[in-house]
Amino acid sequence: MMTLLSTAAAQTTENPFFQNYNTPHQTIPFHLIKNEHYLPAFQEGIRQQEQEVEAIINNPQSPTFKNTIEALEYSGMLLEKVGAPFFNLLSAETNDELQEIAQQVSPLLTEHSNSIFLNDKLFKKVKIVYDKREKLKLNTEQKRLLEKTYESFVNNGANLSDADKETFRQLTKELNLLTLQYGQNVLKETNQYNLLIRDKNLLAGLPEDALKTLAENAEKAGKEGWLLDLKVTHYVPVMKYADNRDLRRELYLAYSSRCMKGGEYDNREIIRKIVNTRLKIAQLLGYQTYADYVLTRRMAEKTENVYHLLDQLLEAYRPEALREYEDIQHFADENNAYFKVQAWDWAYYSEKLKAEKFAVSDELLRPYFQLENVKKGVFGLAERLYGIRFIKNPKIPVYHPEVEAYEVTDRNGKFLAVLYTDFHPRDGKRAGAWMSEFKGQWKEGKKDSRPQIVIVMNFTRPTESKPALLTFDEVTTFLHEFGHSLHGMLSDCTYPSLSGTNVYRDFVELPSQIMENWASQKEFLDQFAFHYQTGEKIPVELIQKIKDAENFNVGYSCLRQLGFGYLDMAWHTLSSPFEGDVVDFEKQTVAKTQILPYVENTAISPTFNHIFSGGYAAGYYSYKWAEVLDADAFSVFEKNGIFDQATAQSFMENILKKGGTEHPMILYKRFRGHEPSIDALLRRNGIISTNN
């Protein structure tokens, strides 16, 4: 184990975190940062914020918004300076040493957070300001910050007795270590599996691009043949295209049984501990369940409202999902399947039926979605809607050679942000796609600190003979994460904790999901979707097929997401400690959303990173919640034109720039004119008539 370094050792001129960055826009000098720099910087950051908090407490003047709430808000800048790159790299470019540091840092940060929120003297000052809030002449953003600060203290145990505060400290420390261990187990077990195929015939049906990727994967490992693993870009093509049913089954079982086979990475006991620790924390704070605790800071507000949404959607989409299963089974029978369609058959026969029904497939579309062109198209969309431009700057340091950095400006050339793009999978990068911040946006005095944003993907790599070509789903993913980045880059707020994506979890997906709507719009695709070999613009007929296919298997897709939502809520609406079997509990919970036969010894929970290590506990429903919002919001663009400047300006001013400065329903109604309903989503998905 690494030993904790002394603060004295931290105070060296060699540690970049203690210097002003001599880089464009004071971006992070990744080339100078070494793993040994993190721990001393964390320790010094903690020490500095402790001093800042002490200064607030010892201020002899009466507590005011400025000397207490604002002073606390702007404290801890060094801690943020080191924490943002560290935790981003822990997901995007991790290694054993970083993970070891994380194990040491996590309890330090938890204890530090507790030392602030459980500080009686500090809370007393915060409460004095809060109690006289009606008499203070605060603007909207100041009121929001005051309310959020006070609620943060209360929700982090400030009103507890001394004994309960100590219990709270221990529980939060345990919880942070458990969630960290859970995520690391998922990554390690995912990376551990591989299957070498030496006979190409066993991979019949796979597109040439996928075969080349798997061959290159084997070559990197010093092996001959085709190396399969559980990374999404390798796993999905096998499930979609491999004619070999036994191979699909083997890979499916490996993927769906991760972290539940009794080995060192088994997460089932960790799940019990996480769920029970969260319950203890919630009940210590006076809530019946952890979901009750979480939802006080969400648009949904109550568990009943979450279940109302999930139940509404289940009732609307389940009949469609059952029809889809019948269609897939009938199609498989017509193709001499002679078996009941199982989980490892679904993607394979779905892809074939989709290709036959709509004459469109991923492989037909890929040639038109060269990554470089898609990137230009997405950037161009932002320029057309919001007047922002992207200029690549190779002088900005990056954390991996594949990462690119862009300066973002408004139409007048004013600097807005730095955007990093990280597109391809590699060892040390977790699966999925996400947006994050290396630095948030905030103002202090005349200084407007502009954000540094990163979007991370796992798109299929280029091969020796072809550039990186995206699937339509990957184009949609790009737009999704880019929508999050717009929320960060266009932020125009005063306080860091209210800026950018610092909004309620069930609101944060609106800016991302609304961007997905442009993916199938002809006027958008015409700007960039050119065949990578011939330069031919994507044909009108193909665009129409994309639109026709948009609602293919929409019922199944919705039920799958609802299953995740119900499972999340089930784990977090428990009102007594869970001592049962994780897999059985899950099986009973998601049964009403399942249309495929149950597969023994598989489960979602052991690798459900979103809720057990990713911040979506009692919050996975927010994807469907935001889908309702985005369908309702995009209907304004559909009515006025998808590039309509007035609509785009309103969305930017009322949503993208505002961060969490007001309650999200107020912001949404200011843009839309009314509260959202599910009707626009049901119409978009063809569940109800467009005339309704």
Segments predicted by a language model, with ranges:
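Short His/Asp/Glu-rich catalytic/ion-coordination signatures at enzyme active sites or charged loops
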Residues: 22-37, 86-105, 128-170, 229-269, ...
